[in-house]
């Protein structure tokens, strides 16, 4: 879940730090999110996980988006859900329901096929609701940060940002306002082209994205190349691991700002 706010005229993105004992991306700063529950669509998963991990509630009461007055009881609802009570039923008992439709699809990342542990992650973008402030759950997540997309990229090594977060921040940094980001997301459609990096052989880890010129000729593993070039598939097209940081770089011989 890509949660945004405007602070001092700058767009900032919200990150949470995963617990050091996590089985995947331990100690990394990531976007809030998690696994879907049975019969749960991706949007609902995103709003539920955001509420569980960060306490931000996208919900409605009698068709209206949650007001600040209603948010006052969100802490108690969150505790019930974290204690194991079904999220949708818990909200319903309080006269509320999640509003997943406010989320805008952004991207769909799939772990490279060469990895033993794999995920299919759909990223959505939304603006922080008025009157709410996120707070990490101190269980799965142990810290949090609001940073501009450009700051996130510059601090990628310190924050231990995984490639999907780095690439997403690169794309977000292309836009000056949240409105522009939301418009760009809507232009991508409800089913963005899946991004499954391929591993390139070499003396250091290198991941190729679907628009990289060597994605099909040099990359190993599965993954669907782009048969066309959408506007978002530009700039850096691969990741190289250097000094504990995934550096987002362009095909050799090209120039990039990322």
Say what each PLM segment does:
Residues 1-3:
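Short beta-strand scaffold segments in enzyme catalytic cores
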Residues 66-115:
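Charged mid-protein connector segments
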């Amino acid at each position: 879940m890509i949660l945004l706010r405007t602070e001092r005229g700058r767009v900032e993105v919200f990150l949470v730090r995963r617990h050091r004992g996590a089985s995947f991306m331990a100690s990394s700063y990531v976007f809030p999110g998690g696994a879907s529950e049975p019969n749960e669509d991706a949007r609902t998963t995103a709003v539920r996980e955001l509420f569980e991990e960060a306490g931000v509630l996208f919900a409605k009461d009698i068709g209206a988006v949650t007001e600040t007055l209603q948010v006052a009881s969100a802490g108690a609802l969150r505790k019930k859900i974290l204690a194991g009570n079904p999220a949708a039923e818990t909200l319903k008992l309080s006269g509320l329901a999640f509003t997943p439709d406010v989320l805008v699809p952004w991207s769909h990342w799939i772990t490279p096929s060469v990895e033993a542990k794999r995920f299919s992650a759909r990223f959505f973008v939304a603006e922080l609701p008025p009157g709410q402030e996120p707070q990490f759950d101190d269980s799965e997540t142990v810290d949090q940060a609001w940073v501009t997309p450009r700051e996130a990229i510059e601090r990628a090594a310190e924050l231990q940002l995984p490639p999907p977060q780095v690439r997403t921040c690169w794309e977000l940094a292309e836009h000056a306002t949240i409105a522009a980001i939301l418009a760009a997301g809507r232009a991508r459609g409800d089913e963005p082209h899946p991004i499954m990096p391929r591993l390139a052989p070499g003396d250091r880890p290198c991941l190729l994205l679907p628009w990289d010129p060597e994605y099909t000729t040099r990359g190993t593993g599965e993954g669907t190349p782009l048969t066309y070039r959408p506007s978002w598939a530009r700039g850096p097209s691969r990741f190289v691991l250097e000094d504990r940081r995934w550096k987002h770089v362009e095909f050799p011989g090209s120039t990039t700002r990322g």
